[in-house]
Amino acid sequence: MSPEEVVDRVYELISFSAGSEPDWPAHRALFTEPTVLALRVFPDDPQITVMDYDSYVVHQMRDGLSEEGYVEIPGERSTTIVGEAAVVLQEFAMKFRDRPPVPAFDAYSLVRVDGVWKIASVISDMITAQQILEEPLTVR
Protein backbone atom coordinates (compact mmCIF):
# COMPACT_ATOMS: atom_id res chain seq x y z
CA MET A 1 0.00 0.00 0.00
CA SER A 2 1.08 3.57 -0.66
CA PRO A 3 1.07 6.14 2.18
CA GLU A 4 -2.29 7.44 0.91
CA GLU A 5 -3.75 3.92 0.85
CA VAL A 6 -2.58 3.34 4.45
CA VAL A 7 -4.31 6.56 5.53
CA ASP A 8 -7.48 5.61 3.62
CA ARG A 9 -7.46 2.24 5.38
CA VAL A 10 -7.13 3.93 8.80
CA TYR A 11 -10.32 5.91 8.12
CA GLU A 12 -12.14 2.79 6.92
CA LEU A 13 -11.13 0.78 9.99
CA ILE A 14 -11.83 3.47 12.62
CA SER A 15 -15.41 3.84 11.36
CA PHE A 16 -18.01 1.44 12.75
CA SER A 17 -21.76 0.88 13.12
CA ALA A 18 -23.76 1.28 16.31
CA GLY A 19 -23.32 -1.74 18.57
CA SER A 20 -19.82 -2.59 17.38
CA GLU A 21 -16.23 -1.33 17.53
CA PRO A 22 -13.43 -0.74 15.05
CA ASP A 23 -11.40 -3.70 13.83
CA TRP A 24 -8.61 -2.89 16.29
CA PRO A 25 -6.14 -5.64 15.23
CA ALA A 26 -6.33 -4.59 11.57
CA HIS A 27 -6.11 -0.92 12.56
CA ARG A 28 -3.12 -1.57 14.86
CA ALA A 29 -1.25 -3.36 12.07
CA LEU A 30 -1.01 -0.03 10.18
CA PHE A 31 1.11 1.56 12.94
CA THR A 32 4.74 1.14 14.05
CA GLU A 33 5.62 -0.03 17.54
CA PRO A 34 6.01 2.27 19.32
CA THR A 35 3.81 4.96 17.84
CA VAL A 36 2.88 8.40 19.16
CA LEU A 37 -0.57 9.94 18.83
CA ALA A 38 -1.15 13.56 19.86
CA LEU A 39 -4.86 14.16 19.38
CA ARG A 40 -7.91 16.03 20.51
CA VAL A 41 -9.92 12.82 20.21
CA PHE A 42 -13.35 14.40 20.75
CA PRO A 43 -14.51 17.94 19.96
CA ASP A 44 -15.17 18.64 23.66
CA ASP A 45 -11.70 17.54 24.82
CA PRO A 46 -10.12 20.55 26.56
CA GLN A 47 -6.68 19.87 25.08
CA ILE A 48 -4.64 17.57 22.89
CA THR A 49 -3.59 14.35 24.63
CA VAL A 50 -0.26 12.66 23.82
CA MET A 51 -0.56 8.88 24.06
CA ASP A 52 0.60 5.52 22.80
CA TYR A 53 -1.62 3.29 20.67
CA ASP A 54 -3.16 1.30 23.55
CA SER A 55 -4.09 4.50 25.41
CA TYR A 56 -5.64 5.83 22.21
CA VAL A 57 -7.93 2.78 21.91
CA VAL A 58 -9.21 3.34 25.46
CA HIS A 59 -9.65 7.09 24.87
CA GLN A 60 -11.41 6.60 21.52
CA MET A 61 -14.03 4.22 22.91
CA ARG A 62 -15.02 6.24 25.98
CA ASP A 63 -18.45 7.67 26.65
CA GLY A 64 -20.43 4.77 25.15
CA LEU A 65 -19.27 5.42 21.60
CA SER A 66 -19.72 1.74 20.71
CA GLU A 67 -23.48 2.12 21.22
CA GLU A 68 -23.63 5.15 18.89
CA GLY A 69 -21.33 4.19 16.05
CA TYR A 70 -18.82 6.58 14.52
CA VAL A 71 -17.56 7.52 11.06
CA GLU A 72 -14.57 9.53 9.84
CA ILE A 73 -14.98 10.94 6.33
CA PRO A 74 -11.72 11.89 4.56
CA GLY A 75 -11.53 15.15 2.59
CA GLU A 76 -8.67 17.05 0.96
CA ARG A 77 -5.11 15.85 1.44
CA SER A 78 -1.51 16.56 0.57
CA THR A 79 1.30 13.99 0.51
CA THR A 80 5.05 14.41 0.41
CA ILE A 81 7.36 11.38 0.12
CA VAL A 82 11.12 11.63 0.63
CA GLY A 83 12.88 8.28 0.43
CA GLU A 84 11.53 6.01 3.18
CA ALA A 85 9.56 8.79 4.91
CA ALA A 86 6.20 10.36 4.07
CA VAL A 87 3.94 13.04 5.47
CA VAL A 88 0.20 13.00 4.75
CA LEU A 89 -1.79 16.08 5.74
CA GLN A 90 -5.46 15.12 5.78
CA GLU A 91 -8.69 17.02 6.37
CA PHE A 92 -11.58 14.86 7.55
CA ALA A 93 -15.00 15.07 9.18
CA MET A 94 -15.89 13.32 12.43
CA LYS A 95 -19.48 12.04 12.31
CA PHE A 96 -21.21 11.15 15.55
CA ARG A 97 -24.82 9.96 15.65
CA ASP A 98 -27.37 12.78 15.78
CA ARG A 99 -24.71 15.51 15.51
CA PRO A 100 -23.47 17.53 12.56
CA PRO A 101 -20.06 16.55 11.16
CA VAL A 102 -17.06 18.11 12.92
CA PRO A 103 -14.22 19.25 10.63
CA ALA A 104 -10.78 18.10 11.75
CA PHE A 105 -7.19 17.74 10.58
CA ASP A 106 -4.70 14.85 10.83
CA ALA A 107 -0.97 14.99 10.11
CA TYR A 108 0.44 11.50 9.56
CA SER A 109 4.16 10.66 9.61
CA LEU A 110 4.81 7.35 7.87
CA VAL A 111 7.96 5.28 7.41
CA ARG A 112 8.63 2.36 5.12
CA VAL A 113 9.65 -0.61 7.29
CA ASP A 114 10.78 -3.74 5.44
CA GLY A 115 9.05 -2.42 2.32
CA VAL A 116 5.74 -1.68 4.09
CA TRP A 117 4.44 1.83 4.84
CA LYS A 118 3.43 2.23 8.50
CA ILE A 119 2.25 5.18 10.56
CA ALA A 120 4.86 6.32 13.11
CA SER A 121 2.90 9.27 14.49
CA VAL A 122 -0.31 11.25 14.15
CA ILE A 123 -1.12 14.74 15.35
CA SER A 124 -4.67 15.99 15.10
CA ASP A 125 -7.04 18.75 16.10
CA MET A 126 -10.46 20.15 15.25
CA ILE A 127 -10.75 22.84 12.59
CA THR A 128 -12.67 25.79 14.03
CA ALA A 129 -14.83 28.17 11.99
CA GLN A 130 -12.03 30.73 12.17
CA GLN A 131 -9.52 28.19 10.85
CA ILE A 132 -11.38 26.79 7.87
CA LEU A 133 -8.64 25.83 5.47
CA GLU A 134 -9.14 27.85 2.29
CA GLU A 135 -5.92 26.79 0.58
CA PRO A 136 -4.95 23.21 -0.27
CA LEU A 137 -2.90 21.48 2.39
CA THR A 138 0.82 21.50 1.74
CA VAL A 139 4.11 20.83 3.46
CA ARG A 140 6.06 23.08 1.08
Protein language model features and the residues they cover:
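Short beta-strand segments enriched in hydrophobic/aromatic residues
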Residues: I14, F31, F92-M94, I123-S124
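Non-catalytic cap/lid and distal C-terminal segments of serine-dependent acyl enzymes
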Residues: Y56-V57, F105, I132-V139
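Short beta-strand edge/turn micro-motifs at domain boundaries
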Residues: V87, P103-L133
